[in-house]
């Protein structure tokens, strides 16, 4: 971009202003890292500094200020947006007991369904080399070094529950690698920990429950991942890119969880059960051998203790070591476990709420989402991550639609693909924290129209979350907008963005008209589209009184019925509804967010306003359950309406018109007028039709090549040339 040079060198601008004044209110690298005098920032390319030698000399500016000005004028500003299809008006808290229990059950079920390494019962065929001694009974326990059990071939195990009838083989001593099956479990401490057959069985079961689970289909050259089964089981919840990726988002999160570290530098552990932590030992006594194309690979990841049956974090750690069985901790990206573990939890919780809870939240588990809080958190994470500064990413604020907004700033002298990749992995690590405010997808749009999307692999269907009943709760927000009206609209069976926009627009217009009629002058509401996104904002007089009246209107139901009727009557007349006949139903829910002014409890008030005085002075939001309208029924009724149909009576039938047209055509080509019923006249004597004379090709060639023909052609050419000269 050459915008920077024109900005500095002229176009009528006053260069006597200081660089700090020219830098607007964006957060330049200098404001974050505070470079000393004479030093430039880490990502400032020397080429940018050399492009402005006269600026520093003429103004007597220090070199770092000159560099900051060059940096400011060679950057791209991006606004953070949240598209309607991937945004929901409701979310859930981390500490919901119902969701915690459901996620724990789901994670445990995933481990069991995708694993053949944990068993309730074990059948151990003894293979002893004890001479004349019996191979059964207590006598064999002293020779456990000779006991070996091989893991069955996963191809044979797929679709079977090995804990019921199959035999499992496990080595208790390191085997000869030439005899190893594709996957082998090694337990070298069986002899030291087994006093009896029951002890031996219990020890093996315990060790297997702490070791990585092996997904069905895991073969020598095709290692299976946990996320493969999840995506295949619920393909509608993931985007096509997610289904086609080699390593899916869930796998990435679990691998990062397995390789993460706690605040003190140790491996990840469960905060509720500190004994359950990930152990990585190079000389582990219990491990799994994988016969990979490049040789034998041993996984040394294991849990230090049994996972608690009802703890989702314990089972997340178990899933993590299973997914990361091929990965070593050394040299791998290691993020904080307190950051990545909640990300895995909320990723699984999003799936669980959809498939196990039918996308319905209990009233106590419903929380509001918030654009402003999410943008502020994203910018704060970028600011507090030194790696972002190293690749030329910072944050700032810009005036957009007369409103100050937090923005992301990227320097032009850094590789844009590297910058976007760094942002993607940062947002992925912090998915848990961001998803708490509603994040599933965001887009960065520059002021010049450049667009970049950041997805965590979920389709828009994952955001179809509703509350079980109409609720009013505190609205946690960091928004500068006092009042917001949001809709979550779904078209069934296919998504149609035009119909969604049309329905939400008509609902907002109807909301304004009907509510003003209901208030009857007690309060006035004005709704308008929120600049830059799909929400609506509104102004209202007497917000606290109005909120109470709105609550009463929702309880009565009549106001909502009027809003719905008025909106749908306008919607069914639109071109968008008629153009797409695939959409049969539309479902929508709404949330009304209002900032309520605190009231003085000492003031005399009516009973309703006395109740308002007891309400929390925090902002409130009012959320509804889904409303469903049968658009197909409305469309059919509109098409059948007699007022839209005009019956035209023709003076002649279509058969008569066709016959008359045929007669006219026959006359025009010289044929006799006839009817379709007239019989064809047979020929009396077929020999009476003379044959055409034979064609003489030689005579034609002679005529073409005769001297007379050439002479006439020459005369014609001479005549044309003479006429051109005369002109």
Curated annotation (Swiss-Prot):
Residues 17-38 have a biased composition (Polar residues). Residues 712-727 have a biased composition (Basic residues). It comes from Rice dwarf virus (isolate Fujian). Residues 1-38, 671-727 are annotated as: Disordered. This is Non-structural protein 4.
């Amino acid at each position: 971009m050459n915008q920077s040079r024109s900005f500095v060198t002229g176009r009528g601008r006053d260069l006597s202003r200081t660089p700090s004044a020219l830098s607007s209110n964006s957060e330049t690298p200098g404001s974050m890292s505070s470079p000393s005098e004479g030093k430039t920032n880490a990502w400032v390319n020397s080429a940018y500094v050399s492009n402005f030698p006269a600026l520093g000399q003429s103004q007597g500016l220090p070199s770092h200020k000159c560099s900051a000005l060059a940096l400011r004028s060679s950057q791209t500003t991006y606004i953070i947006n949240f598209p309607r299809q991937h945004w929901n008006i409701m979310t859930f808290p981390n500490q919901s007991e119902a969701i915690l229990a459901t996620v724990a059950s789901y994670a445990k079920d995933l481990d069991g369904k995708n694993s053949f390494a944990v068993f309730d019962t074990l059948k151990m065929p003894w293979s002893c080399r004890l001479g004349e001694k019996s191979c059964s009974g207590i006598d064999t326990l002293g020779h456990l070094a000779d006991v070996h059990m091989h893991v069955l071939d996963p191809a044979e195990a797929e679709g079977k529950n090995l804990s019921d009838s199959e035999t499992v083989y496990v080595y208790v001593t390191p085997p000869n690698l030439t005899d190893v099956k594709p996957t082998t479990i090694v337990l070298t401490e069986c002899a030291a920990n087994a006093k009896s057959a029951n002890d031996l069985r219990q020890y093996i079961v315990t060790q297997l429950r702490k070791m990585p689970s092996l997904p069905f289909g895991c073969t020598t050259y095709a290692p299976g991942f946990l996320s493969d089964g999840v995506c295949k089981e619920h393909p509608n919840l993931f985007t096509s890119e997610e289904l086609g990726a080699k390593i899916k988002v869930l796998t990435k999160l679990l691998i990062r969880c397995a390789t993460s570290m706690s605040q003190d530098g140790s491996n990840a552990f469960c905060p509720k059960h500190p004994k359950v932590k990930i152990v990585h030992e190079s000389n582990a006594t219990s491990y799994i051998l994988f016969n990979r194309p490049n040789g034998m690979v041993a996984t040394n990841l294991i849990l230090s203790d049994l996972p608690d049956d009802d703890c989702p974090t314990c089972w997340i750690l178990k899933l993590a070591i299973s997914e990361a069985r091929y990965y070593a901790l050394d040299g791998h990206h290691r993020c904080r476990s307190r950051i990545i573990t909640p990300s895995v939890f909320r990723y699984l919780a999003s799936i669980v709420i959809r498939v196990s809870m039918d996308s319905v939240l209990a009233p106590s588990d419903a929380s509001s989402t918030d654009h402003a809080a999410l943008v502020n958190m994203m910018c704060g994470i970028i600011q507090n991550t030194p790696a972002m500064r190293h690749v030329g990413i910072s944050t700032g604020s810009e005036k957009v639609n007369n409103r100050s907004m937090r923005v992301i700033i990227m320097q032009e002298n850094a590789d844009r693909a590297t910058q976007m990749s760094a942002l993607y992995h940062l947002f992925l690590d912090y998915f848990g924290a961001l998803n708490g405010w509603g994040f599933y997808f965001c887009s960065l749009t520059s002021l010049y129209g450049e667009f970049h999307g950041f997805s965590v692999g979920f389709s828009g269907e994952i955001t179809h979350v509703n509350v079980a009943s109409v609720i009013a709760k505190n609205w946690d927000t960091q928004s500068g907008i006092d009042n917001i009206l949001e809709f979550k609209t779904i078209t069934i069976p296919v998504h149609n963005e035009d119909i969604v926009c049309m329905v939400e627009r008509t609902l907002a217009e109807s909301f304004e008209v009907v509510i003003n009629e209901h208030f009857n002058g007690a309060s006035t509401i004005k709704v308008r589209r929120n600049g830059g996104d799909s929400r609506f904002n509104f102004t209202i007089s007497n917000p606290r009184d109005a909120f109470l009246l709105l609550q009463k209107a929702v309880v009565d139901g009549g106001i909502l019925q009027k809003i719905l009727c008025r909106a749908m009557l306008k919607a069914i007349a639109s071109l968008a509804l008629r153009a797409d006949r695939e959409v049969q139903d539309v479902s929508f829910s709404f949330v009304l967010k209002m900032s309520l002014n605190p009231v003085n409890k000492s003031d005399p008030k009516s009973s309703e306003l006395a109740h308002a005085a007891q309400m929390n002075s925090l902002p409130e939001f009012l959320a509804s359950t889904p409303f469903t309208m049968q658009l197909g029924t409305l469309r059919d009724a509109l098409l059948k309406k007699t007022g839209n149909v005009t019956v035209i009576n023709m003076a002649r039938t279509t058969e008569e018109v066709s016959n008359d047209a045929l007669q006219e055509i026959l006359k025009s080509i010289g044929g006799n007028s006839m009817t379709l019923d007239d019989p064809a006249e047979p020929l009396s004597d077929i020999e009476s039709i003379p044959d055409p004379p034979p064609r003489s090709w030689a005579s034609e060639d002679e005529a073409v090549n005769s001297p007379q023909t050439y002479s006439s052609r020459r005369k014609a050419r001479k005549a044309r040339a003479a006429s051109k000269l005369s002109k």
